[in-house]
Structure formats: structure tokens, C-alpha cells
């Protein structure tokens, strides 16, 4: 299949990578796994055995008229331990390479169908100036966009860093969540070829 390239000849790409049916269940699973992997999982509370103190019986068993108590760190008490205390845990989910590649292909194919993937021959800025990048994006009528280049472009990254709803990455930094997070995805022809090789 052929992809239209702004200001250049059409680019021939693989049908298996850019012409797939959209697999919603697979994309959902991979995106959820990606988000789960980003969780810190460091929350922690103390059980009655971990709270400091509470070794001595607060008052004798019988004769006071009060309810019996054996420790001041009971979960019923204020300053006591937590009944089902939260503990640090790993939330990450396993995603097979084949599933990950399948989800990426599915997303890229859907972006093409929805006309949200724009391919240009080359995209760069002369200096790390946000104003220059804004002007370039205005020419292309883009404001909510992920810019993907073949290799790390320091100037482009610095120019995009302070812009709302604009992000610049190289091919290695692209993931399923970033592809669906923006209204449009702007890729250079070089980046398209690299993505195709990566997902082959």
C-alpha cells in the first residue's frame, strides 16, 4: 500500500503493518498493561503488629466496667493499626512481544483510516525555539500533535517541550499510549520506515 507524503512522492509501506483491521480488545489490553506498569505501587500502611507500642494491656481484664482491651493498637482504636493494610505491590502486567507489535500495527492502521497520520518528507527546526515550531505547525494546521522523527532531534525536542498538546519523540520513544493520546500523529518518511522495520 502507499502512504501520501506531504511535499514528496508517495511512500510504499507494508499492508500487514499499516493496513490491519482494528483489534479493539488487543489495543485495550496493551494500553491497560502500559498504564499499570507506570504505577508506583509504593503505598504502605501498618497492621496492628507493625504499629509502634501497644505491648502492655491498657487496663485489667475485669472489674473496671469498661470493655475488655488487650492493646491500644487494635484496629478498632484511634491510633491503632489498619485491618487490611495496603502494602507495596508490583502492578505490572506481562505483554508478549507479538501482542505489543499487533497493538502498534492496529493503532497505526486505524490512524491512517481516520486520516490522523500525516507523513512529511522531513521535519525539523533551525534552533530550539518554540515560536519557530508553532509557526511550522500552524502551516500544517496542527495543534494537538505527536511528532515522530527517525532520530533524536534535540532542537525539536526542546522547542516542543513547553507546548501544550505537542510532543516530539524519536521512533524508540513511541508507545501505544502516546499514539492514541494526540489528535494527530506527524511522522517523517524516515520514521515510518523505521517503525515498519521495528514491527516487521
From Swiss-Prot:
<dbReference type="GO" id="GO:0005840">
    <property type="term" value="C:ribosome"/>
</dbReference>
<dbReference type="GO" id="GO:1990904">
    <property type="term" value="C:ribonucleoprotein complex"/>
</dbReference>
<comment type="function">
    <text>Forms part of the polypeptide exit tunnel.</text>
</comment>
<dbReference type="GO" id="GO:0003735">
    <property type="term" value="F:structural constituent of ribosome"/>
</dbReference>
<feature type="region of interest" description="Disordered">
    <location>
        <begin position="42"/>
        <end position="65"/>
    </location>
</feature>
<comment type="function">
    <text>One of the primary rRNA binding proteins, this protein initially binds near the 5'-end of the 23S rRNA. It is important during the early stages of 50S assembly. It makes multiple contacts with different domains of the 23S rRNA in the assembled 50S subunit and ribosome.</text>
</comment>
<dbReference type="InterPro" id="IPR023574">
    <property type="entry name" value="Ribosomal_uL4_dom_sf"/>
</dbReference>
<dbReference type="InterPro" id="IPR002136">
    <property type="entry name" value="Ribosomal_uL4"/>
</dbReference>
<dbReference type="InterPro" id="IPR013005">
    <property type="entry name" value="Ribosomal_uL4-like"/>
</dbReference>
<keyword id="KW-0694">RNA-binding</keyword>
<dbReference type="GO" id="GO:0006412">
    <property type="term" value="P:translation"/>
</dbReference>
<dbReference type="GO" id="GO:0019843">
    <property type="term" value="F:rRNA binding"/>
</dbReference>
<comment type="subunit">
    <text>Part of the 50S ribosomal subunit.</text>
</comment>
<keyword id="KW-0699">rRNA-binding</keyword>
<keyword id="KW-0689">Ribosomal protein</keyword>
<comment type="similarity">
    <text>Belongs to the universal ribosomal protein uL4 family.</text>
</comment>
<keyword id="KW-0687">Ribonucleoprotein</keyword>
<dbReference type="Pfam" id="PF00573">
    <property type="entry name" value="Ribosomal_L4"/>
</dbReference>
<protein>
    <recommendedName>
        <fullName>Large ribosomal subunit protein uL4</fullName>
    </recommendedName>
</protein>
Amino acid at each position: 500500500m502507499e502512504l501520501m507524503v506531504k511535499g514528496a512522492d508517495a511512500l510504499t509501506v507494508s499492508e500487514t503493518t499499516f493496513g490491519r483491521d482494528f483489534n479493539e480488545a488487543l489495543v485495550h489490553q496493551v494500553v491497560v498493561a502500559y498504564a499499570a506498569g507506570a504505577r508506583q505501587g509504593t503505598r504502605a500502611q501498618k497492621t496492628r503488629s507493625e504499629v509502634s507500642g501497644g505491648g502492655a494491656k491498657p487496663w485489667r481484664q475485669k472489674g473496671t466496667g469498661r470493655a475488655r482491651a488487650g492493646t491500644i493498637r487494635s484496629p478498632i482504636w484511634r491510633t491503632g493499626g489498619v485491618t487490611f493494610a495496603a502494602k507495596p505491590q508490583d502492578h505490572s502486567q506481562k505483554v508478549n512481544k507479538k501482542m505489543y507489535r499487533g497493538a502498534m500495527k492496529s493503532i497505526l492502521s486505524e490512524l491512517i483510516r481516520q486520516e490522523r497520520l500525516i507523513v512529511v518528507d522531513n521535519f525539523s527546526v533551525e534552533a530550539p525555539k518554540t515560536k519557530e515550531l508553532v509557526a511550522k505547525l500552524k502551516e500544517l494546521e496542527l495543534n494537538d500533535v505527536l511528532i515522530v522523527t527517525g532520530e533524536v532531534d534535540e532542537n525539536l525536542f526542546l522547542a516542543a517541550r513547553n507546548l501544550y498538546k505537542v510532543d516530539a519523540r524519536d521512533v524508540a520513544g513511541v508507545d501505544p499510549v502516546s499514539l492514541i493520546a494526540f489528535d494527530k500523529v506527524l511522522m517523517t518518511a524516515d520514521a515510518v520506515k523505521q517503525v515498519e522495520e521495528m514491527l516487521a
